[in-house]
């Protein structure tokens, strides 16, 4: 049998909120320093070394945190798909001089691109959709936004985008675009409009 395993998102390798808070970087979740890169590299090393069984952390978007009592079991996949905004980045943190990067373990990489105005629109639309659904759950980390009006919701989403997502996009994500083997350009309707393949 041919088995494809998706190791969910690299969010599973974020540090828990407790550690991020202790380091004063909870508001930088999604930036390079918020990931346990060593743990992710160890996982990929084990996969490439032929070890068959792997247990990886699970991230909950509802609780906005790593679930301490939950894990994902990956067993001997023929193809392993690792997805995340950080996976093509190189380590540039002070005091760290890793010569091995996450992307070194990839046989093929894909970057999904879109115009920034479309990304902003999608983010605001998704935030509003979640405000009316998942944010209503009292256990949700974002329950504090549940009673926002439509206009307040849009303003809050745009503020979060401007203060967190936009800097991360421009400083850390976009610069990795041309490190990918394949670039898919999406239009405002989410359909792929162009495909670029890096020639070797």
Where are these regions (language model features)?
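Short glycine-/polar-rich loops that comprise or flank the Walker A/P-loop
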Residues: 3, 103-108, 178-181
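N-terminal leader/propeptide and maturation segments of large enzyme subunits in energy/redox metabolism
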Residues: 135-143
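Conserved protein kinase catalytic core
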Residues: 15-17, 89-90, 119, 193
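NTP-dependent small-molecule kinase module
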Residues: 75, 128-129, 145-200
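ATP-dependent NMP and nucleoside kinases share a basic, alpha-helical "lid"
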Residues: 66-135
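Hydrophobic/aromatic beta-strand patches that form the interior of the parallel beta-sheet core
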Residues: 6-8, 81, 108-110, 182-184
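Conserved nucleotide-sensing/catalytic segment adjacent to the nucleotide-binding pocket
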Residues: 3-67, 73, 79
């Amino acid at each position: 049998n041919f088995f494809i395993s998706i190791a969910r998102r690299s969010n599973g390798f974020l540090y828990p909120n407790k550690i991020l808070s202790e380091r004063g970087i909870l508001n930088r979740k999604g930036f390079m320093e918020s990931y346990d890169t060593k743990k992710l590299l160890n996982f990929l090393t084990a996969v490439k070394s032929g070890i068959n069984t792997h247990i990886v952390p699970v991230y909950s978007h509802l609780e906005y945190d790593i679930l301490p009592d939950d894990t994902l079991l990956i067993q001997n996949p023929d193809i392993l798909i690792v997805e995340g905004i950080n996976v093509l980045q190189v380590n540039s943190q002070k005091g760290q001089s890793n010569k091995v990067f996450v992307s070194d373990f990839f046989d093929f990489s894909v970057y999904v691109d879109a115009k920034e105005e479309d990304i902003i629109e999608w983010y605001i639309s998704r935030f509003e959709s979640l405000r009316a659904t998942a944010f209503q759950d009292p256990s949700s980390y974002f329950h504090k936004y549940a009673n926002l009006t439509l206009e307040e919701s849009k303003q809050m989403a745009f503020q979060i985008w401007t203060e967190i997502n936009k800097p991360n996009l421009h400083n850390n994500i976009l610069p990795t675009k041309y490190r990918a083997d394949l670039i898919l350009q999406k239009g405002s309707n989410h359909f792929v409009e162009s495909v670029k393949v890096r020639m070797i």
